[in-house]
Every structure is written in C-alpha cells, then in structure tokens.
Amino acid sequence: IHPETGLPIAPERFGWTSVFAREIARIARADPTVVGITAAMTRPVGLGRFADEFPDRVIDVGIAEQHAMTMAAGLARAGMRPVLALYSTFMNRGFDQLIMDVALHREPVTVVLDRAGITGDDGASHNGVWDLSIAAMVPGLRTAAPRDGEELAALLREALAHDGPALLRYPKGALPEPIPALSSHSWGDVLFSGERPEVAVVAVGSMVPVALEAAGRSDVPVRVLDPRWALPVADGLVDELMSGYRGVVTVEDGLVDGGVGSEIALALARAGYTGGQAHIGVRREFLDHRTRASALAREGMTADDVLSGISAAGRADGPALLRPRGARSA
C-alpha cells in the first residue's frame, strides 16, 4: 500500500481503468451493438482501445455530459447497447437526463464511473463521492461496485446483459490482489466469516480490503459481505442481516448520508431490526485537497475506524445508529 495514496502499489497496466479498457474492447469485438460514449475523455476513462479498433462506434460529445446521457438513451431506444464512461464527479452534470431520459424509460444504458470515491490529490472538485447517493434515489437503476479486477470484468458483462439502466463505479489507481468469495448468493458474496459471527460488515467496492483488514484484527466474530450490486438493497441481503447478528456495519467510499449505509439502515428499520448499527463513509461536506490516505483518516474510514464500528455495533443493546469519527483536525 502506498503511504500517501492509500492504494495498492502496482504498474498502471494493473489499474482499474486498464481492466475496463481491455474488457470493453473484448466485449465490443463480440457484440456490434455495443457503443462507447464519453465527454472529452476518451482515453482517460478507458475507451481508447475501443476507439482505436472501432472508431465509428465511440462517440466523444465534448464537455457535454447532459447531451451524452440523452444520446445514450436514444441509442439504447434504437437497439444499441451504449456504455457511457465518465469520471464520477462529472456524472452530476447529467443527473436530470439520467432520471428523465434513461431511467424513466428503462433504457439499457450502462454508465461506467471511473475515479469514484475519494480521489485525493486530483483536487476537491474531483472527489467522486456523490454517485451512490444520486443512484440510490433513481428508480430502476442498478448500481455495482467491484472489489477487484475480476469482479469489474464480470459486473460489466452483467450490466450489459441487464434489460434496464445500470451503473458501475470504481476508484482511481491500482487494483488490490484478487479477493475470492467464500460463498456466493443471490444478494452477493461472503468474503470472511469468523466462528459464530456476531457482527455483519457490508463492504462496498474499494472499501472491501479495509473491511477485511479490520475483520482479521477484530476480537468480535465478524462476517464480511460484499453485495456486488449495492443498490437497490437486495431483499436477500436484508434477510441475511436479519438472521441473528447483534450488529451491522456498513463501509462505503462515498457519502454515507443517502448512500448504501442509509439505504441499508432504512431497509433494516422497515424489517424491524433491533441491533446496533455503524455506518462509515464520507460526511456530508466538501473535502479539501489532500492525499487519499489523509482524507480516509480524516473521514473516519480506516481499518481502525471499522474496528471501532464493529465494537460499538456489537455491544449495542438496542437500535442505535453509530458512526465512528475520524481525526477531523488531521
């Protein structure tokens, strides 16, 4: 792990963007209905290889995310399978079109968001922390967050096979080592399980390694769950969380207010869950310009913070919403 970025150290060819670039080109060779769309960022978002091989099937609309989203909806209506690739922070510009042109009509558009979550020294405006909260409020939109390169490739194919809109998000930087599942279910994967686990940790995408580190150090027996398709929250995941855990912890690289943690808390409330809860993610505030590692520490999103959440949720005697606090002065 790089001490400044908080990301795995690996050559660029093993980065998230490179995996997407290889996989979308491979898919495009086999399916002529797949087209790529981007907003003045063909190579930064990983569509360069696709464009080199099929220049008439990759469209760069310029700095016009609203137009890109509407064009994707139109191409989908015409029978194509558009893949709209953006930086996460720039999807905000196409929010209205995502709702009214794509989701309202259930068009099979796949939105791929690079640099999702805390990006660190790209600058305050480039932190992609809004997408999960945005996606959570859009009816019919499925949202996936891969934990490693193999999952990125698999989820991209699942998104393109879906008969409605789908969103795929992943962070900037290098990939972790492959993270195998202990078992797979309709709602996602079990990645770690202590003996007679008392606390369930739901880890989203790039936060899976952080959750696994905390689980390995925890004195409280823990089970780590990866929902894969994080939104909407699957009924099967709620059933799993209602199956006897004393506490539930969620960890996501995005706004915790309105994001996956909030959606899980609401689902558990509706189901009558009475255990403790801790929801870890970015606060509802603008992040300043700092390294990713520093931002994670400031926001209370490190393995130590997850450990604190496990401890607090596991010992709660009744329904309680708990959130570990980071070092705000860092």
Placement of each model-derived feature along the sequence:
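Extended, hydrophobic alpha-helical segments in both membrane/secreted and soluble proteins
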Residues: 46, 58, 65-85, 94-98, ...
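Phosphate/diphosphate-binding loops
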Residues: 80-170
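Thiamine diphosphate
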Residues: 2-52, 60, 66-69, 104-127, ...
